[in-house]
Amino acid sequence: MCQTCRVGKRRDAREQIEAKIVELGRRQLLDHGAAGLSLRAIARNLGMVSSAVYRYVSSRDELLTLLLVDAYSDLADTVDRARDDTVADSWSDDVIAIARAVRGWAVTNPARWALLYGSPVPGYHAPPDRTAGVATRVVGAFFDAIAAGIATGDIRLTDDVAPQPMSSDFEKIRQEFGFPGDDRVVTKCFLLWAGVVGAISLEVFGQYGADMLTDPGVVFDAQTRLLVAVLAEH
Protein backbone atom coordinates (compact mmCIF):
# COMPACT_ATOMS: atom_id res chain seq x y z
CA MET A 1 0.00 0.00 0.00
CA CYS A 2 1.34 3.44 -0.88
CA GLN A 3 2.39 5.82 1.90
CA THR A 4 -0.22 8.39 0.88
CA CYS A 5 -2.98 5.77 1.07
CA ARG A 6 -1.90 4.71 4.56
CA VAL A 7 -1.83 8.30 5.78
CA GLY A 8 -5.27 8.92 4.28
CA LYS A 9 -6.75 5.84 5.94
CA ARG A 10 -5.27 6.80 9.32
CA ARG A 11 -6.68 10.30 8.98
CA ASP A 12 -10.12 8.95 8.05
CA ALA A 13 -10.06 6.56 11.00
CA ARG A 14 -9.09 9.37 13.36
CA GLU A 15 -11.86 11.63 12.05
CA GLN A 16 -14.40 8.83 12.52
CA ILE A 17 -13.32 8.30 16.12
CA GLU A 18 -13.36 12.04 16.84
CA ALA A 19 -16.87 12.29 15.38
CA LYS A 20 -17.97 9.37 17.58
CA ILE A 21 -16.48 11.08 20.63
CA VAL A 22 -18.52 14.21 19.89
CA GLU A 23 -21.65 12.11 19.38
CA LEU A 24 -21.14 10.36 22.72
CA GLY A 25 -20.46 13.73 24.34
CA ARG A 26 -23.82 14.97 23.05
CA ARG A 27 -25.52 11.97 24.65
CA GLN A 28 -23.81 12.71 27.95
CA LEU A 29 -24.99 16.31 27.77
CA LEU A 30 -28.54 15.09 27.29
CA ASP A 31 -28.36 12.55 30.10
CA HIS A 32 -26.15 14.31 32.65
CA GLY A 33 -25.51 17.90 31.59
CA ALA A 34 -22.11 19.50 31.11
CA ALA A 35 -21.09 18.70 34.69
CA GLY A 36 -21.50 14.99 33.94
CA LEU A 37 -19.15 14.81 30.95
CA SER A 38 -16.72 11.92 31.37
CA LEU A 39 -13.93 10.91 29.02
CA ARG A 40 -13.65 7.61 30.89
CA ALA A 41 -17.26 6.79 30.08
CA ILE A 42 -16.68 7.73 26.45
CA ALA A 43 -13.64 5.47 26.35
CA ARG A 44 -15.73 2.58 27.69
CA ASN A 45 -18.39 3.17 25.04
CA LEU A 46 -15.71 3.15 22.37
CA GLY A 47 -14.21 -0.06 23.73
CA MET A 48 -10.95 1.71 24.57
CA VAL A 49 -8.85 1.85 27.69
CA SER A 50 -9.27 5.27 29.28
CA SER A 51 -5.74 6.36 28.40
CA ALA A 52 -6.32 5.73 24.68
CA VAL A 53 -9.10 8.32 24.34
CA TYR A 54 -6.63 11.06 25.28
CA ARG A 55 -4.91 10.53 21.94
CA TYR A 56 -7.99 12.11 20.39
CA VAL A 57 -9.23 14.49 23.10
CA SER A 58 -6.59 15.83 25.45
CA SER A 59 -8.87 16.74 28.36
CA ARG A 60 -12.43 17.30 29.52
CA ASP A 61 -12.02 20.98 28.65
CA GLU A 62 -11.05 19.97 25.12
CA LEU A 63 -14.21 17.85 24.93
CA LEU A 64 -16.27 20.84 26.08
CA THR A 65 -14.67 22.97 23.37
CA LEU A 66 -15.47 20.37 20.72
CA LEU A 67 -19.08 20.21 21.91
CA LEU A 68 -19.38 23.99 21.94
CA VAL A 69 -18.07 24.30 18.39
CA ASP A 70 -20.32 21.44 17.29
CA ALA A 71 -23.42 23.03 18.85
CA TYR A 72 -22.70 26.56 17.63
CA SER A 73 -22.07 25.23 14.13
CA ASP A 74 -25.25 23.15 14.08
CA LEU A 75 -27.32 26.09 15.32
CA ALA A 76 -25.83 28.46 12.74
CA ASP A 77 -26.27 25.91 9.93
CA THR A 78 -29.92 25.54 10.95
CA VAL A 79 -30.36 29.31 10.72
CA ASP A 80 -28.67 29.42 7.31
CA ARG A 81 -30.97 26.69 5.99
CA ALA A 82 -34.03 28.47 7.35
CA ARG A 83 -33.02 31.69 5.60
CA ASP A 84 -32.45 29.80 2.35
CA ASP A 85 -35.82 28.05 2.62
CA THR A 86 -37.83 31.13 3.59
CA VAL A 87 -39.18 33.47 0.95
CA ALA A 88 -38.64 36.69 2.87
CA ASP A 89 -40.55 39.63 1.42
CA SER A 90 -38.79 42.04 3.74
CA TRP A 91 -35.90 42.36 6.14
CA SER A 92 -38.34 41.95 9.04
CA ASP A 93 -39.48 38.58 7.67
CA ASP A 94 -35.81 37.58 7.57
CA VAL A 95 -35.27 38.59 11.20
CA ILE A 96 -38.35 36.63 12.26
CA ALA A 97 -37.21 33.57 10.27
CA ILE A 98 -33.83 33.67 12.02
CA ALA A 99 -35.44 33.96 15.44
CA ARG A 100 -37.84 31.09 14.73
CA ALA A 101 -34.97 28.90 13.55
CA VAL A 102 -33.00 29.61 16.72
CA ARG A 103 -36.01 28.74 18.88
CA GLY A 104 -36.74 25.59 16.89
CA TRP A 105 -33.19 24.38 17.33
CA ALA A 106 -33.21 25.16 21.05
CA VAL A 107 -36.49 23.35 21.69
CA THR A 108 -35.18 20.32 19.79
CA ASN A 109 -31.77 20.44 21.50
CA PRO A 110 -32.35 21.71 25.05
CA ALA A 111 -29.16 20.22 26.50
CA ARG A 112 -27.02 21.78 23.77
CA TRP A 113 -28.82 25.11 24.20
CA ALA A 114 -28.01 24.91 27.91
CA LEU A 115 -24.35 24.38 27.05
CA LEU A 116 -24.35 27.50 24.87
CA TYR A 117 -26.60 29.83 26.87
CA GLY A 118 -27.07 28.27 30.29
CA SER A 119 -24.89 28.56 33.37
CA PRO A 120 -21.14 28.56 32.64
CA VAL A 121 -19.30 25.35 33.44
CA PRO A 122 -17.21 26.05 36.57
CA GLY A 123 -13.50 26.32 35.81
CA TYR A 124 -13.92 26.17 32.04
CA HIS A 125 -12.91 29.03 29.77
CA ALA A 126 -13.71 28.65 26.07
CA PRO A 127 -10.70 29.43 23.85
CA PRO A 128 -11.71 32.51 21.79
CA ASP A 129 -9.58 31.49 18.82
CA ARG A 130 -11.68 28.33 18.41
CA THR A 131 -15.14 29.46 19.51
CA ALA A 132 -15.58 33.19 18.84
CA GLY A 133 -16.02 32.95 15.07
CA VAL A 134 -18.55 30.15 15.10
CA ALA A 135 -20.33 31.57 18.16
CA THR A 136 -21.13 34.84 16.36
CA ARG A 137 -22.51 33.39 13.13
CA VAL A 138 -26.14 33.72 14.24
CA VAL A 139 -25.52 37.26 15.48
CA GLY A 140 -23.98 37.97 12.09
CA ALA A 141 -27.14 36.68 10.41
CA PHE A 142 -29.25 39.11 12.45
CA PHE A 143 -26.91 41.98 11.57
CA ASP A 144 -27.16 41.04 7.90
CA ALA A 145 -30.96 41.08 7.97
CA ILE A 146 -31.08 44.36 9.90
CA ALA A 147 -28.59 45.96 7.51
CA ALA A 148 -31.13 45.29 4.75
CA GLY A 149 -33.68 47.25 6.77
CA ILE A 150 -31.26 50.16 6.96
CA ALA A 151 -30.71 49.97 3.20
CA THR A 152 -34.45 50.22 2.51
CA GLY A 153 -34.86 53.15 4.88
CA ASP A 154 -37.22 51.27 7.19
CA ILE A 155 -34.60 51.54 9.93
CA ARG A 156 -33.42 55.12 10.07
CA LEU A 157 -30.01 56.27 11.21
CA THR A 158 -29.57 59.22 13.54
CA ASP A 159 -26.78 61.36 14.91
CA ASP A 160 -27.20 59.88 18.38
CA VAL A 161 -23.90 58.81 19.92
CA ALA A 162 -23.82 56.51 22.93
CA PRO A 163 -21.68 57.47 25.94
CA GLN A 164 -18.22 55.99 26.32
CA PRO A 165 -17.07 53.29 26.51
CA MET A 166 -20.26 52.03 24.87
CA SER A 167 -19.73 53.97 21.65
CA SER A 168 -16.20 52.61 21.20
CA ASP A 169 -17.46 49.09 21.84
CA PHE A 170 -20.16 49.56 19.22
CA GLU A 171 -17.62 50.83 16.72
CA LYS A 172 -15.61 47.62 17.17
CA ILE A 173 -18.78 45.63 16.52
CA ARG A 174 -19.50 47.63 13.37
CA GLN A 175 -16.00 46.96 12.13
CA GLU A 176 -16.15 43.24 12.96
CA PHE A 177 -19.46 42.63 11.19
CA GLY A 178 -19.33 45.34 8.54
CA PHE A 179 -22.58 46.66 10.02
CA PRO A 180 -23.85 50.10 8.94
CA GLY A 181 -26.03 50.81 11.98
CA ASP A 182 -25.37 53.77 14.26
CA ASP A 183 -25.08 53.54 18.03
CA ARG A 184 -28.84 53.70 18.52
CA VAL A 185 -29.45 50.86 16.07
CA VAL A 186 -26.70 48.72 17.60
CA THR A 187 -28.35 49.22 21.00
CA LYS A 188 -31.62 47.98 19.51
CA CYS A 189 -29.77 44.97 18.08
CA PHE A 190 -28.58 44.10 21.58
CA LEU A 191 -32.18 44.40 22.78
CA LEU A 192 -33.29 42.03 20.01
CA TRP A 193 -30.61 39.46 20.82
CA ALA A 194 -31.25 39.62 24.56
CA GLY A 195 -34.99 39.31 23.98
CA VAL A 196 -34.66 36.33 21.65
CA VAL A 197 -32.18 34.42 23.84
CA GLY A 198 -34.06 35.31 27.02
CA ALA A 199 -37.46 34.26 25.70
CA ILE A 200 -36.09 30.98 24.37
CA SER A 201 -34.27 30.24 27.63
CA LEU A 202 -37.39 30.90 29.70
CA GLU A 203 -39.22 28.34 27.58
CA VAL A 204 -36.47 25.72 27.26
CA PHE A 205 -35.55 25.83 30.95
CA GLY A 206 -39.19 25.53 32.02
CA GLN A 207 -39.41 28.95 33.65
CA TYR A 208 -42.87 29.68 32.27
CA GLY A 209 -44.25 26.69 34.12
CA ALA A 210 -46.05 23.70 32.66
CA ASP A 211 -49.53 25.24 32.44
CA MET A 212 -48.97 28.94 31.76
CA LEU A 213 -48.77 28.94 27.95
CA THR A 214 -50.82 26.76 25.62
CA ASP A 215 -48.57 27.53 22.64
CA PRO A 216 -45.20 29.08 23.54
CA GLY A 217 -44.32 29.35 19.85
CA VAL A 218 -47.17 31.79 19.22
CA VAL A 219 -46.08 33.89 22.20
CA PHE A 220 -42.49 33.85 20.95
CA ASP A 221 -43.60 35.08 17.53
CA ALA A 222 -45.49 37.95 19.18
CA GLN A 223 -42.43 38.85 21.25
CA THR A 224 -40.20 38.78 18.20
CA ARG A 225 -42.54 41.01 16.20
CA LEU A 226 -42.51 43.56 19.02
CA LEU A 227 -38.71 43.54 19.02
CA VAL A 228 -38.68 43.99 15.24
CA ALA A 229 -41.07 46.93 15.61
CA VAL A 230 -38.63 48.57 18.01
CA LEU A 231 -35.92 48.33 15.35
CA ALA A 232 -38.08 50.34 12.95
CA GLU A 233 -39.18 52.96 15.48
CA HIS A 234 -38.07 56.48 14.56
Curated annotation (Swiss-Prot):
<dbReference type="GO" id="GO:0006355">
    <property type="term" value="P:regulation of DNA-templated transcription"/>
</dbReference>
<feature type="DNA-binding region" description="H-T-H motif">
    <location>
        <begin position="38"/>
        <end position="57"/>
    </location>
</feature>
<dbReference type="Pfam" id="PF00440">
    <property type="entry name" value="TetR_N"/>
</dbReference>
<dbReference type="InterPro" id="IPR009057">
    <property type="entry name" value="Homeodomain-like_sf"/>
</dbReference>
<keyword id="KW-0804">Transcription</keyword>
<dbReference type="InterPro" id="IPR050109">
    <property type="entry name" value="HTH-type_TetR-like_transc_reg"/>
</dbReference>
<dbReference type="InterPro" id="IPR025996">
    <property type="entry name" value="MT1864/Rv1816-like_C"/>
</dbReference>
<dbReference type="InterPro" id="IPR001647">
    <property type="entry name" value="HTH_TetR"/>
</dbReference>
<keyword id="KW-0238">DNA-binding</keyword>
<dbReference type="Pfam" id="PF13305">
    <property type="entry name" value="TetR_C_33"/>
</dbReference>
<dbReference type="GO" id="GO:0005737">
    <property type="term" value="C:cytoplasm"/>
</dbReference>
<keyword id="KW-0805">Transcription regulation</keyword>
<comment type="function">
    <text>May participate in the regulatory network that controls the expression of MmpL lipid transporters. Binds to intragenic and/or promoter regions of rv1816, mmpL3, rv0204, mmpL11, mmpL7, kasA and mmpS3.</text>
</comment>
<dbReference type="GO" id="GO:0000976">
    <property type="term" value="F:transcription cis-regulatory region binding"/>
</dbReference>
<feature type="domain" description="HTH tetR-type">
    <location>
        <begin position="15"/>
        <end position="75"/>
    </location>
</feature>
<dbReference type="InterPro" id="IPR036271">
    <property type="entry name" value="Tet_transcr_reg_TetR-rel_C_sf"/>
</dbReference>
<keyword id="KW-0963">Cytoplasm</keyword>
<dbReference type="GO" id="GO:0003700">
    <property type="term" value="F:DNA-binding transcription factor activity"/>
</dbReference>
<protein>
    <recommendedName>
        <fullName>HTH-type transcriptional regulator Rv1816</fullName>
    </recommendedName>
</protein>
<comment type="subunit">
    <text>Homodimer.</text>
</comment>
